[in-house]
Each structure stands twice: as C-alpha cells, then as structure tokens.
Amino acid sequence: SLGLVGSEMCIRDRDGWTFPNFDYDGNFNDILDKIYNCNVYIGHEGIEGCLAEGADVVITGRAADSALFLAPLKYEFGWAADDWDNLARGIMAGHLLECGGQGAGGNYMYDWRNVPRMDELGFPIAELTDDTFEITKAPDCGGIICEQSCKEQFLYEVHDPANYLTPDVNVDISHATITQVGDNRVRIGGVKGKPRPDTLKLCVGYHKGWKTVSMLSFAWPDAYEKAQYCAEVIMKKMQRRGMKADDIHISYIGLNSLHLGVADMSEEALKNLNECVLRIAVFSEDKSECAKIIPEISPLQLNGPPGASFFGGRARVQEVMALWPTTVPRDAVQVESHILEVK
C-alpha cells in the first residue's frame, strides 16, 4: 500500500492576508503574476493518517523534515494530538536525524579532523523511551555521536531555543540536556512543548529576473592585483556597451567570495597569493542586458592582464527564481491523504 499526502490552498482567495516577507519589506501584489510555485510546510497529520490506513510507504509533498519522523512515532506510541511534550520530543528526535550523516559527524565544526572513518560515515539512530531519548549509530559505520556533535545539530536552524516553531508543536529546548552516556551514545532530556502555531510557513517561488556569472583565474605573481585590474577593464567595456544592470557583484574566490566585508584584504594577505579567481555576477530584469558581458570575458585571456585563464565554459544567461518566505493561516490549507494499492 502506497500513501500519498498533498495539500491545497488558493493563493488568490486571500481574504485579507498580506503575506509579509520574512526577509524584507515588499508588497505581495507585486509578484502575484510572476509566481511559479507555492509550497506550504505541512506537519505530520497526513503521514500519520496514511500509516493508520496501512500504508507501507508514504510519499508527501513539502512537509517539515522533522514531521517525517514524528508521524511514525506518534502513530506507534499513540500520543494524543495535544501531548505537547511528547510531540516536542518526537520533533527534536527527528531534528537530530533529518540531515542524515550531519548528525553523526558530517559537517562537524568542533573537531572534524578526528571524526573516525568519515569515508564510511553512518546515519544517526534515535531510541525513544517514555521521557528521554538517545542518539546512537550502527557500530560498523564511521562517524561520531558525542555531546558536541549533537549540540551542533540540535541548534541548527533554531532562532529562539524557547520557541522553535514547527507545524506540529512549538518546541522549548532552552532547558534541554545533552549527556554522553556511552561510546557513540548521547541522551537528550528536558525537551518541552507548547501548542502549535496558528500559521504555517509558505515558500513562494517567483520570477525575479536574469543573471550571468563569469570567472577568470590569475596566477602568481600579483594574482590579486591582476584580477582586480581585469575587473576594471570589464567594467569599462560594459560602460561603452551601455549595459544597464540592476546589480553587479564582484568578488575574488580565495579571498572574499565567502567572507565579503570581513575578509582579510591586508597587503600581507594579498601579496603572495599563488592564484586568485575573479568572479563577476550580473543581475538584470532585462535578459538582453545580462548577455552583453558574455562575449567580453573569453578574449581577456590574451587581451587583458597576464597569467589569466578562462574556465568553466562560456557563461550563459540564467533565469533567477526568487523566494518569498511568509506564513499562511493554518485553516486555509487543506491536507489530503490517499491510499493507493500497488501490485
């Protein structure tokens, strides 16, 4: 038996909803005719319903990651819909499992050099009792389960430890305990729950414009100086061509492409670089404006500063799909589940 879970809502039948953007001020009406998709983060109910009807496998649309774990836990243990503490424990157990190997030493910042057998990294396992739960892993897999690795996973994506909002429960981990109780075994306690929010997270994807990204690498000596000068050359060429970009972002991979304004750009850091990659990203609502930069990049291997190489293939114009993160009233979303018998 195959369980199918989906949800429906009408974005145009808004009844006064304003869909405020989490990230910046904006008017939802401005993107209404540019929308490609809408995904509501639903909770565990539809999945649990399929399990109750005998589903062997459940396929769902967008759901909160931790809901995939809460549903079978609630179904098996028979937790009540308002048993907020147990629901919160189930959510946090799922939270520690949902990223796979990340919960067992992958992406581990504290002591990544000493994670055993990362080439054979296993996934974490949650074992729940009445009031606590433990995280472990299969003994024949690589990785590590320790207090620090679980703390990193426990806190990721959590803005307010006293109010971690999910579709199923408002989780309070502000007094949670994480204790090493054995080799590759950690016990979690003190997780509490409060009534779930009245809204659900809604992610709206919409057309925003166009972009192109070009890169040129430069070798020692004076790698950064040459890359910087090449950026000036490109900008002068674009001015002559009358390019009207809405945004141009110039960065130097190996220097500031990740750290931006806090990167070390001192003379000492720059003078002996073995190599430096110039990255120029252009954004415009007009596709033709983005295209103007493309034919100017490749010739700069020979028509620009010395020691340049062009890589990654010829740049191309790509559509930009932007995200409008917001919320929608819970009662506006209809969750449906069906059972399909497959032979």
Residue ranges and their predicted role:
Residues D15-W17, P72-D83:
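A glycine- and small-aliphatic-rich helix-loop capping segment at beta-alpha/alpha-beta transitions
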